Amino acid sequence: MSQCPLCHSWDVHRIHTSSERLGSREFFLCSVCDLVHVPARYHLDNDAEKARYLLHNNDPADPEYRKFLSRLWNVVRAELSSGAQGLDFGSGPGPALVHMATEDGFDILPYDPYFAPDQSVLESRFDFITCTETAEHFSSPGTEFKQLHSLLKAGGILGVMTSMSADWSQFPNWHYNRDPTHIAYYSRRTLEWVSDSLHMEVDFPTANVAIFRKPSEVR
């Protein structure tokens, strides 16, 4: 049995065992928060994980990649005031969203444990945080979402983009489970659980995008 890394419940059950060329993995669904996770024994080591990320085509100049990121950025940008300061959490080897936000006149810093690992960045507080195609790599999503919440100023917004499942019975056929760096999988119900646990509001303005809002007066 494997404890849920989001809500820490033991009420989980295995929904799939893969047999990909990179090795077999087990996937467990939590009955409490609806997260599917891969147990730690199947996680890649740091060197293998970083090498996998370097295979991604995240060129900041790629118009198709920018179009992809704009699904989240356009929603976040529409809610920002002039002078808003932001953080791109999990910025990756090609921090395209940092380039896009900077071009739109916003101050934004990158943070990534492999590619922009300056921990001093995490000592600040931000008006907005973007987290694109990163949450699926969280090994301890309960801890990591709490960290994101703590990095937001009161009244701030957190934009998360990750593929979400509408039907876990289809999980074995979902291409998303084939990437060995993907170890946490979400539904809307999962992210609603996150928002409730952190006393935030959340809505889903477009496919695979969640916008969390921290109250102006923190409860």
Describe each model-derived feature in a short phrase.
Residues 155-163:
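Conserved beta-strand signature within the Rossmann-like core of class I S-adenosyl-L-methionine
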Residues 170-174:
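Short acidic, glycine/proline-rich loop/turn micro-motifs
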Residues 163-168, 184:
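Short "lid" loop at the C-terminus of a central beta-strand within the Rossmann-like core
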Residues 138-139, 152-154:
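Helix-to-beta-strand junctions that scaffold the AdoMet/dcAdoMet cofactor pocket
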Residues 1-128, 132, 145-146, 161, ...:
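Conserved N-terminal segment of class I S-adenosyl-L-methionine
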Residues 115, 136, 165:
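Active-site micro-motifs of SAM-dependent methyltransferase domains
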Residues 130-140:
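A short SAM/SAH-binding and catalytic strip from SAM-dependent methyltransferases
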